Amino acid sequence: MYILVQHTISEPAVFWNAADPNTLSPQLKLHHTFPTPDGTHAVCIWEADSVDTLRNALEPVIGRVSTNEYFPVENREGFARPSRVPQAATAGASSR
């Protein structure tokens, strides 16, 4: 499953030096990291078996210097609509 992690980082130097995906289990895959220029916020996209699996791996490493929110997300061909939100019949239709 894909998991988005939203980080609010109190100590950017500590966080970014500790955040090395190569030291984690091969069961976890980091796809993208989107940090702000000052390093105090970031959004990362991971792939793992579950949110709990990822949380249990990351929190001991970065939890003391950041507040982290974890969300399961959907991704198909880089663009996805929420699967639980009904799509209107006209959504996505072009008016030509």
Per-region residue spans from a language model:
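Short S/T/G/P-rich N-terminal loop/turn motif that feeds into the first structured element of a domain
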Residues: M1-H41, E47-A57, S66, Y70-R96
